[in-house]
C-alpha cells in the first residue's frame, strides 16, 4: 500500500511552488503526457462532436429566399459590424464617427498600461481592466441592438 501525499496550503513547499507560478498540476507534474495526450484530444473531439451535431440538426434554409428584384426596406451590414454602423449612423459628423472608431483600438491598447504594476492574472484582482472590458462589452451590445432599430429610437432602444 502506497502513501499518497495530498497537497495542502499549509505545506511551505506547496505554497512556494504555487507562488512561483506552478499551475493546477500538483508538485510540478509535467504537461506531457497527461495534458497533451489525454485532455487535449478529449476537448478537441468534444468540440468537433458539438459542431457536427449542431450542423446536422440545423435546417438548410434560414429566412426568406433571395429575390433580386425586391430591394429590402433597410440594408443592414453583417451582425459584427452593427456597433460600428450605429456609431456612423448616429454621430452627426462623420469625422467624429471615424475618430470614435479609431479610438476603440487605441483604448484597448492602453488598458494593459493602466494596470501594469498589477502582477495578478486573475480578473477579479485586476478591477480596472475588468471594468473597462465589461463597459466596452455592454456598449458594444447596446450599439449592436440599436443598429437594428429605427434611427429615432436607436440610442435609447425605445426604453426611455
Swiss-Prot record:
Recorded GO CC terms: chloroplast thylakoid membrane
PROSITE patterns to which the protein is assigned, alphabetical: CYTB_CTER
Annotated GO biological process: photosynthetic electron transport chain
Transmembrane segments: 36-56, 95-115, 131-151
Pfam families assigned: Cytochrom_B_C (PF00032)
Protein origin, superkingdom: Eukaryota
Keywords: Chloroplast, Electron transport, Membrane, Photosynthesis, Plastid, Thylakoid, Transmembrane, Transmembrane helix, Transport
GO MF term list: electron transporter, transferring electrons within cytochrome b6/f complex of photosystem II activity; electron transporter, transferring electrons within the cyclic electron transport pathway of photosynthesis activity; oxidoreductase activity
InterPro entries: Cyt_b/b6_C (IPR005798), Cyt_b/b6_C_sf (IPR036150), Cyt_b6/f_cplx_suIV (IPR005870), Cytochrome_b_C_euk/bac (IPR048260)
Membrane topology of the entry: Multi-pass membrane protein
Compartments in which it is found: Plastid, Chloroplast thylakoid membrane
Quaternary state and interactors: The 4 large subunits of the cytochrome b6-f complex are cytochrome b6, subunit IV (17 kDa polypeptide, petD), cytochrome f and the Rieske protein, while the 4 small subunits are petG, petL, petM and petN. The complex functions as a dimer.
Family according to the record: Belongs to the cytochrome b family. PetD subfamily.
Role noted for this protein: Component of the cytochrome b6-f complex, which mediates electron transfer between photosystem II (PSII) and photosystem I (PSI), cyclic electron flow around PSI, and state transitions.
Protein name (record): Cytochrome b6-f complex subunit 4
Gene this protein is translated from: petD-A
Amino acid at each position: 500500500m502506497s502513501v499518497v501525499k495530498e497537497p495542502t496550503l499549509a505545506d511551505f513547499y506547496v505554497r512556494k511552488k504555487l507562488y512561483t507560478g506552478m499551475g493546477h498540476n500538483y508538485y510540478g507534474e509535467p504537461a506531457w503526457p497527461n495534458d497533451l495526450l489525454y485532455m487535449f484530444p478529449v476537448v478537441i473531439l468534444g468540440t468537433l462532436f458539438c459542431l457536427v451535431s449542431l450542423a446536422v440538426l440545423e435546417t438548410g434554409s434560414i429566412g426568406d429566399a433571395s429575390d433580386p428584384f425586391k430591394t429590402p426596406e433597410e440594408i443592414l451590414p453583417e451582425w459584427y459590424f452593427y456597433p460600428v454602423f450605429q456609431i456612423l449612423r448616429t454621430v452627426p459628423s462623420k469625422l467624429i464617427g471615424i475618430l470614435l472608431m479609431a479610438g476603440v483600438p487605441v483604448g484597448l491598447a492602453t488598458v494593459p498600461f493602466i494596470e501594469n504594476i498589477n502582477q495578478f492574472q486573475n480578473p477579479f484582482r485586476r478591477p480596472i481592466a475588468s471594468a473597462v472590458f465589461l463597459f466596452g462589452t455592454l456598449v458594444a451590445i447596446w450599439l449592436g441592438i440599436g443598429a437594428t432599430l429605427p434611427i429615432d429610437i436607436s440610442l435609447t432602444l425605445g426604453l426611455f
